[in-house]
């Protein structure tokens, strides 16, 4: 239990002990939780200066009741022991900066690269606390914005299709005739076509199944704007997945901006404006092709541990266990 996310409930099955009793005894007697030096402020902030490295990741996660915490991890530790650098309550940049200032300045200055999402508060934290570090915006957050823009257009068309179907049913009822919806050659009605096209719009065309390929053909024929939007999203995916140098990526991104301007879609114009604000951070991805996958993976580990506990009753004790598993050496 000191070095792995094992629960007392799991041990109960193998050692025939009462899990509630073991949990209480571990908390009060077997562990050093009651004498833990970080206990007083654990629910506000935890920092582990010895775990800092040259490559960090910063992200936010929800631990209980939807309350967010900012997590800083050492990417070079790959989610193992001593990977946890800091856990701070909330996402307010001032609070996180104050917590990270407990780490000696010499250690903060040795950080060379920090991966983060598109959050302005995270950007401010990195700029203030790690002055010599290169900021790298996660490519998957960038791609997600484009995918969300395509899905937003699809959903808008779907609502219109649902309303159109409702109107047709009402008219058929008033005229005393049976309502027979129009169906495309693959058997989908208009609203079914738009509902069932959700997942294919997330994928590259070469990964479509035969039925998805047929559905996409009909969808793009009926809704040319979706075809254009999907093309913009796909071309951005190709730019980000291509192994190239920063200057070549800059040129490709500029051409993508021109396509967005020509398309005239509001959502993509907003994305382009967002990219412009984070332009250098996005292009820094091409230096080492670093992503925030380490932070996302660590978030998944926290959520899996929380799920195995069936929720968090004592947040301080949960943070103590996280620290024992991921912050201290084994």
Regions found by a protein language model. Name each.
Residues 31, 65-67, 75-81, 97-98, ...:
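Acidic/histidine-rich catalytic cores and adjacent linkers
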Residues 57, 115, 135-137:
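A structural signal for short, well-ordered beta-strand segments and their strand-loop junctions
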Residues 133-134, 157-161:
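Short, polar/flexible loop-turn hinges at active-site or ligand-entry regions and domain interfaces
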Residues 10-27:
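Short, basic interhelical loop/turn and adjoining N-cap
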Residues 147-159:
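Short, surface-exposed amphipathic charged segments that create phosphate/polyanion-binding patches used
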Residues 1-6, 241:
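Short, amphipathic alpha-helical "recognition" segments used to contact nucleic acids or chromatin
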Residues 132-148:
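Inter-helix linker motif
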Residues 24-113, 120-125:
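RNase H-like nuclease fold core
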């Amino acid at each position: 239990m000191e070095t792995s996310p094992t629960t007392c409930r799991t041990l109960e099955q193998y050692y025939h002990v009462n899990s509630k009793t073991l949990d209480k005894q571990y908390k009060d007697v077997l562990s050093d939780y009651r004498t833990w030096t970080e206990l007083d402020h654990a629910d506000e902030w935890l920092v582990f200066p010895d775990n800092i490295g040259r490559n960090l990741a910063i992200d936010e996660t929800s631990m209980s009741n939807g309350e967010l915490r900012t997590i800083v991890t050492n990417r070079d530790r790959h989610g193992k022991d001593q990977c946890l650098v800091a856990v701070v309550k909330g996402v307010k940049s001032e609070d996180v900066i104050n917590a990270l200032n407990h780490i000696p300045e010499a250690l903060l200055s040795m950080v060379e690269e920090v991966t983060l999402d598109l959050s302005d508060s995270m950007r401010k934290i990195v700029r203030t606390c790690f002055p010599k570090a290169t900021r790298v915006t996660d490519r998957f957050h960038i791609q997600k914005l484009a995918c969300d823009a395509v899905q937003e257009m699809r959903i808008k068309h779907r609502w219109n299709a649902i309303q159109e179907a409702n109107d047709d049913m009402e008219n058929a009822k008033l005229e005393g005739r049976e309502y027979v919806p129009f169906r495309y050659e693959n058997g989908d009605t208009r609203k079914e076509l738009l509902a069932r096209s959700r997942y294919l719009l997330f994928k590259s065309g070469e990964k479509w199944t035969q039925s998805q390929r047929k559905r996409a053909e009909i969808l793009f024929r009926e809704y040319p704007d979706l075809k254009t939007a999907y093309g913009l999203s796909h071309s951005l995916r190709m730019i980000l997945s291509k192994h190239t140098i920063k200057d070549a990526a800059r040129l490709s991104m500029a051409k993508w901006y021109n396509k967005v301007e020509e398309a005239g879609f509001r959502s993509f114009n907003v994305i382009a404006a967002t990219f412009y604000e984070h332009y250098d951070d996005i292009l820094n991805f091409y230096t080492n092709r670093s992503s925030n996958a380490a932070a996302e993976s660590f978030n998944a580990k926290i959520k899996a541990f929380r799920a195995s506990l069936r929720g968090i009753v004592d947040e301080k004790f949960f943070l103590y266990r996280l620290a024992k598993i991921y912050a201290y050496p084994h």
